[in-house]
Amino acid sequence: MIERGKFRSLTLINWNGFFARTFDLDELVTTLSGGNGAGKSTTMAAFVTALIPDLTLLHFRNTTEAGATSGSRDKGLHGKLKAGVCYSMLDTINSRHQRVVVGVRLQQVAGRDRKVDIKPFAIQGLPMSVQPTQLVTETLNERQARVLPLNELKDKLEAMEGVQFKQFNSITDYHSLMFDLGIIARRLRSASDRSKFYRLIEASLYGGISSAITRSLRDYLLPENSGVRKAFQDMEAALRENRMTLEAIRVTQSDRDLFKHLISEATNYVAADYMRHANERRVHLDKALEFRRELHTSRQQLAAEQYKHVDMARELAEHNGAEGDLEADYQAASDHLNLVQTALRQQEKIERYEADLDELQVRLEEQNEVVAEAIERQEENEARAEAAELEVDELKSQLADYQQALDVQQTRAIQYNQAIAALNRAKELCHLPDLTADSAAEWLETFQAKELEATEKMLSLEQKMSMAQTAHSQFEQAYQLVVAINGPLARNEAWDVARELLREGVDQRHLAEQVQPLRMRLSELEQRLREQQEAERLLADFCKRQGKNFDIDELEALHQELEARIASLSDSVSNAREERMALRQEQEQLQSRIQSLMQRAPVWLAAQNSLNQLSEQCGEAFSSSQDVTEYLQQLLEREREAIVERDEVGARKNAVDEEIERLSQPGGSEDQRLNALAERFGGVLLSEIYDDVSLEDAPYFSALYGPSRHAIVVPDLSQVTEHLEGLTDCPEDLYLIEGDPQSFDDSVFSVDELEKAVVVKIADRQWRYSRFPEVPLFGRAARESRIESLHAEREVLSERFATLSFDVQKTQRLHQAFSRFIGSHLAVAFESDPEAEIRQLNSRRVELERALSNHENDNQQQRIQFEQAKEGVTALNRILPRLNLLADDSLADRVDEIRERLDEAQEAARFVQQFGNQLAKLEPIVSVLQSDPEQFEQLKEDYAYSQQMQRDARQQAFALTEVVQRRAHFSYSDSAEMLSGNSDLNEKLRERLEQAEAERTRAREALRGHAAQLSQYNQVLASLKSSYDTKKELLNDLQRELQDIGVRADSGAEERARIRRDELHAQLSNNRSRRNQLEKALTFCEAEMDNLTRKLRKLERDYFEMREQVVTAKAGWCAVMRMVKDNGVERRLHRRELAYLSADDLRSMSDKALGALRLAVADNEHLRDVLRLSEDPKRPERKIQFFVAVYQHLRERIRQDIIRTDDPVEAIEQMEIELSRLTEELTSREQKLAISSRSVANIIRKTIQREQNRIRMLNQGLQNVSFGQVNSVRLNVNVRETHAMLLDVLSEQHEQHQDLFNSNRLTFSEALAKLYQRLNPQIDMGQRTPQTIGEELLDYRNYLEMEVEVNRGSDGWLRAESGALSTGEAIGTGMSILVMVVQSWEDESRRLRGKDISPCRLLFLDEAARLDARSIATLFELCERLQMQLIIAAPENISPEKGTTYKLVRKVFQNTEHVHVVGLRGFTPQLPETLPGTVDAPSEAS
């Protein structure tokens, strides 16, 4: 037998009066005895706090607060604690012999609110030897100890092996652990559960009959049947969803016609406009292409006219240009004639001026020689004067320096500085950087010798110059003549050049004599050359017009070829007319054939659409009508097979549903009559008794009872006999077993268990052998397992049945579609594609149009070729007479050759004319050029150089002389020697100064005299040069003017210029006549071009307007196409058969659909607004938006749980198939889901009966409880009259109220509430909804009334009320009720915790002095019988004979208050035994 868990001890740490106190709790009753304020309530408060650490519930009031609505601010807990860390711990041991210490850490929180902080914790695995006080205290010395904080306690326990410490952040987790370990009787999941538990403890603590508990005994004693409520909620949710789906199906069925109408009209409205725009776009494109072709043709014509105009304009421009050139040439020829005449006169002037210049040239040369000699003498005089000046200046400077240095103080310094300066100047002039004062004398001799040598060389050159002066004048005259003829040259080349010039003069005079014959020859050749150029121009013009270059030899053959071409082209033009008529006739035939095919195309397209739909639906491709009929036969066979299979699956599914319904009956009864019989006999079904049997034991018990597994267990078979008489409404075999349903077991049979079977010995001569069933159905677990497998099978069958039903209906609709196709489209569906033939014919029509266009172009080209041939013949007639000139290729070369020879002759004539006189003068004196007389100029340069060298040598010698003279200054001698030396030097300087000044005077006078003579020579030379330059300038001007005239002024030039002018005049007249002809032709051509330009402008305007319209429409069309493709509606809108309707027909179709749509969407604001916007003809994309909006609207209306598609059209097609199947299936499902009212009544009655039996069993434990005059206590459970009436109506008269339960608008709960109101109209339901009332009526607890009754004295059984009982009787009665509640909780929670745990039972009783000794003994007896622990607080006069008693005395010692505790086990005559662990712990350290 499982031992019940017990509370071992209660430990208080740092409570008021208890520093570290452990109370060992008795297994039955623990009594706390003591006077007022001894600490009894504090001890119980510590126990309750550790048990329920919820500050929202804890409230420890005393008797002074009885009847108060609120207690003290701290609710009695803050004042029971001391400052610092406090603990309250419960040491327990459960049924598994596990020691568990649970408790709380408490600590006062500073503040006026007097709050307390609580932290619950639990300790597991603590050794039995460790006391709780040892855990939370630390001994400091013999008289002092310290309380450990919670974190130190945690660390201390973690260090102990095998000990687990848990700290909880929520009370729910704390209580969950206590429930799992068997410390409390009920799982406290919520604050409401904790409140019930606390109210129970509070009622126990303060005693009496608690109104809070007696008013809600149903909540304390009757378990909530959550499974039944959840089953009803799930059923109602399933029914609600089922009904919503059925309602959606009905709405969908009602909307189906609207869907069809809306889709049909929206498709007609949008598709007609869509195809009309597509047709218009194609028409506009065709028109634009036609305009472009006409524009291209007109442009070609205009281009041809422009080419013609350009040719004529070019020819006219050529003639205009030629006319201008001819006019210019004519004017130039006239001007040339005038220029020739002017040049002849100019040539005469030039000859006169040349003679004058020759004379001036001779005089100028003579005067130049005189001036040159004067200049040389002038330069010599200037050099001597300059040297004299320099010498005087140097001497004066030296003399001045000498005078300045006479100062005694500065003489040596000045002389030394002068010496240094002279030495530096000598170094610089002599280029001797190493010169010193000592070596100056040696260098002076060297430089004096250089000065003497330079003077001698200069005098020698001066003598040579005077001798070469005479020879130089003749050489210069001849040299100047050579320079004048040849230009600048070296003097040593003058002899060779002069001889070459004389020989060239002879040749030039010979060439000058041939000028006249060459001119005459050139004039004749130039005339022939002009005629040849004219012929070449005509030939080039002809070749350009023909587009090909021709040789001269080919011209005659070309002339004959062109004449033959003219004849052939005239014949081709006549044949082209007949060919054009044949092409036009074929074009008309093609057009008529295309029209007939376009009429047949819509019918064929409709047949193809139907055929394609059939192919998509069946996944087959049909190539002939025979394939269609064969597939139809296969379809019929497949339909028959599917129907047979569907019926088979449906039958199996119904069988599974029936079995599930049978197994789902409450109590395991497969026959509803058994429930009624069990209720009638006052018994219980055997299957209900074994309802909790496990799945593993189910086969055994099913075989054990065999056919009697559906028996009814009754308390007494003799009482059933009268009910069996005349019983007809029962199964064929009805088994009745006598036994107590509350304590029934299987001992009624003698059983031998075999392998997977049992042998039941029913009687001595009757045995039954039963094997274990493969699928046991005995017990709720076995039935649930079977139901679960059946549900899985039913899901598979339902899915298969739905698939087969869908396939059957789909096949039937496919069969109907094939039948419609055969009746309507089979005749035309497999004919050839008319659109493909139309495309071929259109291609042929385009080819014919192209052929006609090419034919017109060829005819036009032939006419052009005819005109070109005629022009070519005309041109050849002009060219052929001049073929000889064209063949003369050397004519131009001969002209160039004669022209070159003439140019050479004329150049020679000009040379003779220009240099003839100079050559005549040069010839007598040319021999002097053989040798240059000592090269006079070089001699002059050498003379000037020698003068400069002589001057430099003189200066260098003077500088060295000065250094030598100043050598004394470099050595500082005594003053006497320097004075005498200075005196000599002064005298020498003065003498040299006088001589130098005399020399300077003579040089100045000679310079002035010679300068005056040089000025006279220069004046004469300037006069001659001025006259020569003037004449030369005039001659040059005349020559430039003659050159500017650019003509050769010979004797025949004037006659040639006159002939040239007359020829150009004749050419100009011919050119003007041709230009007038071209201007007239050009005027006609421009008029034709103007007409073509106007036509072209109109065509361009029409084309661009059409193109702009096409481009604009294309942008909108692109947006439309993009929208169509993005939304996937192209297949719906692009109806090819509409392409063959006219725009008016399509517009009429769209307008009709628009009228229908306005009515259809009148109630839909969104679609109405979108439809109104779509009526704008300029915004075709809005119609697409409307179509998409319609599709979106329909998609939203489609229930995706019914139709698995987003396409409304496909949804409508599937809707016909799916709706009927879903309606049938959902109706059947609703019938299966809906539980009958009789079943509900039976479930509630069974539950009430079960709970009544349980309460009856609880009452048995209270039969012998007595307190004072109270002899017994019991709970009375009755069914309310109003609810009993409801159950009777549900089970017996439910047919009268089927209007409520069969209504689709009401759930079962609402129907139940309506029935309750109908049966009890006098009851006010308040503001509660029918759903809320119905849910309450589904809870069996609301059907019961519970009250506590006591058997008191002579009054018998009466209702237990505080006013009718004494205080002791009320306390005892209340305690009995609390024991019943605890036991009920244990029974309810047994299935939630481990089966090997029996929870602790403990109650409190404060102020037990109100009970007499007999009542206290009754409590002891009750505790012993129920294995319950009790803690009693009583004054000192209470002395129970059993249990453990603690004497509590509160003492004050040295301002320290503590409670002295002595524990005694029972009261007997013997000496009291002191209990271990009752000695007070050391007092708290001060």
UniProtKB/Swiss-Prot annotation:
Alphabetical GO biological process terms: cell division; chromosome condensation; chromosome segregation; DNA replication
Function statement: Plays a central role in chromosome condensation, segregation and cell cycle progression. Functions as a homodimer, which is essential for chromosome partition. Involved in negative DNA supercoiling in vivo, and by this means organize and compact chromosomes. May achieve or facilitate chromosome segregation by condensation DNA from both sides of a centrally located replisome during cell division.
UniProt note: domains: The hinge domain, which separates the large intramolecular coiled coil regions, allows the homodimerization, forming a V-shaped homodimer.
Binding site for ATP: 34-41
Entry keyword annotation includes Iron: no
Name of the protein this chain belongs to: Chromosome partition protein MukB
Chief localization: cytoplasm
Annotated family: Belongs to the SMC family. MukB subfamily.
Any GO molecular function: DNA binding
Cytoplasm recorded as keyword: yes
Cellular component, GO annotation: cytoplasm; nucleoid
Subcellular location: Cytoplasm, Nucleoid
Region (Flexible hinge): 666-783
HAMAP family named among the record's database cross-references: MukB
InterPro entries tied to this protein: MukB, MukB/SMC, MukB_hinge, MukB_hinge_sf, MukB_N_dom, P-loop_NTPase
Coiled coil: 326-418, 444-480, 509-603, 835-923, 977-1115, 1209-1266
Self-association state and partner proteins as the record states: Homodimerization via its hinge domain. Binds to DNA via its C-terminal region. Interacts, and probably forms a ternary complex, with MukE and MukF via its C-terminal region. The complex formation is stimulated by calcium or magnesium. Interacts with tubulin-related protein FtsZ.
Entry keywords, A to Z: ATP-binding, Cell cycle, Cell division, Chromosome partition, Coiled coil, Cytoplasm, DNA condensation, DNA-binding, Nucleotide-binding
